[in-house]
């Protein structure tokens, strides 16, 4: 079903290439996971190029839970422990404690404040003491190996940033419909057309990475 609805946007490889161009240009992408998994679409931006306007769109059109995807080594560097010791969530989503920048924010809730927190966390010279805990940004720890290890939006986000030549850090939020229900692929495609955002799937990223590995072998 996913692939048939997405076929007008090209092959899996072409959809990833289009997404990488969008990210390199500082724009966002929409990533849908498998229909037999969460079957949800996330709006994703590079943390490196994220703007206040983009954050406002995430908050306005999404679930409100704005997450910062980080690789394992960055999570360890920032000394961010897991949100819970025993993760019993259905898909093992690796939330850490939530964070807030210690400087440059007010309540931490506004779009500008959340962007400040994200930029603080991904700064080259970032230190654990730069961040207060808890806060209004929710870091997610990506599994090493990306989508080849776990087919989640967290890993897909990090893979896309690396493939685009950007810092391995991305911001995501699930897209919801006006009535509060989760947007599925058909609604995600309509949302993408409205906001000029390319749409791709986690499976597309898997296929793209497999093609790169095949070329290298």
Swiss-Prot record:
Chain positions of site Essential for catalytic activity: 136, 174
InterPro entries: DHBP_synth_RibB-like_a/b_dom, DHBP_synthase_RibB
Transmembrane helix in keyword set: no
Entry keyword set: Lyase, Magnesium, Manganese, Metal-binding, Riboflavin biosynthesis
Cofactor info, note text: Binds 2 divalent metal cations per subunit. Magnesium or manganese.
Annotated HAMAP family: RibB (MF_00180)
Family: Belongs to the DHBP synthase family.
Protein name: 3,4-dihydroxy-2-butanone 4-phosphate synthase
Origin species: Shewanella sediminis (strain HAW-EB3)
């Amino acid at each position: 079903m996913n692939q048939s609805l997405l076929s007008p946007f090209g092959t899996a490889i072409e959809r990833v290439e289009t997404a990488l161009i969008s990210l390199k240009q500082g724009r966002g992408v929409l990533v849908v996971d498998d229909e037999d998994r969460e079957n949800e679409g996330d709006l994703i931006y590079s943390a490196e190029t994220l703007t206040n306007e983009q954050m406002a769109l995430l908050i306005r059109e999404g679930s409100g839970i704005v997450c910062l995807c980080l690789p394992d080594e960055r999570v360890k560097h920032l000394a961010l422990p897991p949100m819970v010791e025993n993760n019993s969530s259905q898909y093992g989503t690796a939330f850490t404690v939530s964070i807030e920048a210690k400087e440059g924010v007010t309540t931490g809730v506004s779009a500008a404040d959340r962007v400040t927190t994200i930029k603080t966390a991904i700064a080259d010279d970032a230190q654990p003491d730069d961040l207060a805990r808890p806060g209004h940004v929710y870091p997610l720890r990506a599994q090493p190996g990306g989508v080849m290890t776990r087919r989640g939006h967290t890993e897909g986000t990090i893979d896309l940033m690396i493939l685009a030549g950007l810092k391995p850090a991305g911001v995501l939020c699930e897209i919801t419909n006006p009535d509060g229900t989760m947007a599925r692929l058909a609604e995600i495609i309509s949302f993408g057309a409205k906001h000029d955002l390319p749409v791709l799937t986690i499976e597309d990223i898997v296929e793209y990475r497999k093609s790169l590995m095949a070329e290298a072998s």
